[in-house]
């Protein structure tokens, strides 16, 4: 401390004032960002979805038959939107569509079964034909795949690697290429794409999934600037763990909401992006947002410390998954 004081004493007074001012400004911006985060999480409401269309306007949802996609369908239907439900299994889509038709008077649904991992251009052509003439106001890019368990990149199954990139990246881009022209033509629309903490913080043992979500982060932010002047709002929705089949987590906690809680927040906080480092990105669930802010403003999302911590955590998850699989194999 004496050495620091000695060095500080050699700085001219105007320099001391300048350095103190810079430090105070930095602290003020950090405090302001955190206060904005709290306002976004607990007080402010996002853009009213009626901006994107009156009752009976259509929304397109990918990965619609399970988890977050199914919950997006249920909540958008409750808000008066008709739905184009896109997922792999026709029977699940039929059940969901029928359930929503019975629950909401006047509700309409169209279903389209496609396997995004096939990357079949004819599927996208048929999807374009299905939605032709519909007044579409919202696109939810929810379809996605992760690794079955955390796995070293060099041990990743080739099909799993390809499916993750094809579904998460190409599936999202090609669906958006089909739907976005309709939104741009009507001069108003919303595109929500599901992101992940794995796209914000490089995640060892989920390297391919992490990279695919980082790709979506930059693509979505870039697209938001391109479509803004055409009246289309584009946002990336960042999530941590949610109790879904993909996460394999069943119990909720302070840091882990269920799909209903998360989707309610996602639809209720659209456009509240000011506390995020990336343009047109938001973390709707409050504890996710606080956790993310703390990491980014202390150790850093890209720091060696965070990378090492993430690696050790996923090694532990992998080991537990392998032990569980071994126990189940012995029972057979």
Curated annotation (Swiss-Prot):
One of its GO terms (biological process) is fatty acid elongation. InterPro entries: 3_ketoreductase_fungal, NAD(P)-bd_dom_sf, Sc_DH/Rdtase_CS, SDR_fam. The keyword Transmembrane applies. Its EC number is 1.1.1.330. The chain crosses the membrane at residues 15-35. GO terms for molecular function: ketoreductase activity; very-long-chain 3-oxoacyl-CoA reductase activity. It is a single-pass membrane protein. Gene3D superfamilies: NAD(P)-binding Rossmann-like Domain. Pathway: Lipid metabolism; fatty acid biosynthesis. It is an enzyme of class 1 (oxidoreductase). Keywords: Endoplasmic reticulum, Fatty acid biosynthesis, Fatty acid metabolism, Lipid biosynthesis, Lipid metabolism, Membrane, NADP, Oxidoreductase, Transmembrane, Transmembrane helix. Belongs to the short-chain dehydrogenases/reductases (SDR) family. Component of the microsomal membrane bound fatty acid elongation system, which produces the 26-carbon very long-chain fatty acids (VLCFA) from palmitate. Catalyzes the reduction of the 3-ketoacyl-CoA intermediate that is formed in each cycle of fatty acid elongation. VLCFAs serve as precursors for ceramide and sphingolipids. This is Very-long-chain 3-oxoacyl-CoA reductase. It comes from Neurospora crassa (strain ATCC 24698 / 74-OR23-1A / CBS 708.71 / DSM 1257 / FGSC 987). The lineage of its organism: Eukaryota, Fungi, Dikarya, Ascomycota, Pezizomycotina.
